[in-house]
């Protein structure tokens, strides 16, 4: 897949400790994070879905993938007609890029993983159940579908009525 491996849904958190306690009360488990970010950061997971809690000015929610060899990955995306909104590829920071779908939803690509997932039993789940999908609003279903298909996703039949 051109995006890489899915990492997390990044969320802006005004108080990371408070957010962490909230998600833990729902059955999520804290993952071990490194010092990848210059801001407070924590990750919780139910073993299937990881939520990155960032005390930073980020778009939220922000689906995030790990894309090794990010420079080359961005070249591949360009050949697919995908425009990169922002890229940081300097030696002083973690390599990352942000692109947007036709409806403006940002997606982030990181060159390296920012946490180590904990070992959880396959039977572990949060009190919320299992994560099924991440739905995005769009005014142009055809353009949005074409964008995501270029990135390797497979479209279901569109639902045109509520």
Over which residues does each language-model region extend?
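N-terminal beta-strand motif that seeds the catalytic metal site of vicinal oxygen chelate
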Residues: 1-17, 61-63, 110-146, 150-157
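Vicinal oxygen chelate
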Residues: 14-17, 62-106, 138-145, 150
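Alpha-helix termination/capping residues and helix-transition junctions
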Residues: 3, 25, 57, 79-81, ...
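Conserved positions at the start
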Residues: 6, 39-41, 60, 94-96, ...
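Short amphipathic beta-strand starts and helix->beta connectors
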Residues: 46-49, 83, 118-120
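Conserved short beta-strand elements that form part of the metal-binding/catalytic scaffold
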Residues: 29-62, 106-113, 153-162
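Hydrophobic, helix-prone linear segments
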Residues: 1-48
């Amino acid at each position: 897949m051109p995006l890489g491996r899915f990492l997390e849904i990044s969320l802006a958190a005004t108080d990371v400790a408070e957010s962490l306690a909230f998600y833990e009360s729902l059955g999520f488990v804290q993952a071990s994070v490194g010092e990848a970010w210059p801001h407070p950061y924590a990750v919780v997971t139910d073993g299937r879905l990881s939520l990155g809690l960032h005390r930073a000015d980020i778009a939220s929610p922000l689906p995030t993938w790990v894309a090794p060899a990010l420079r080359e990955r961005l070249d591949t995306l360009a050949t697919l007609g995908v425009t990169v909104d922002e890229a940081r590829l300097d030696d002083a920071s973690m390599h990352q890029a942000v692109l947007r779908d036709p409806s403006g939803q940002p997606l982030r690509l990181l060159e390296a993983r920012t946490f180590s997932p904990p070992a959880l039993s396959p039977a572990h789940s949060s009190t919320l159940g299992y994560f099924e999908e991440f739905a995005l609003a769009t005014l142009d279903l055809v353009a949005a579908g074409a964008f995501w298909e270029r990135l390797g996703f497979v479209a279901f039949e569109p639902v045109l009525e509520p």
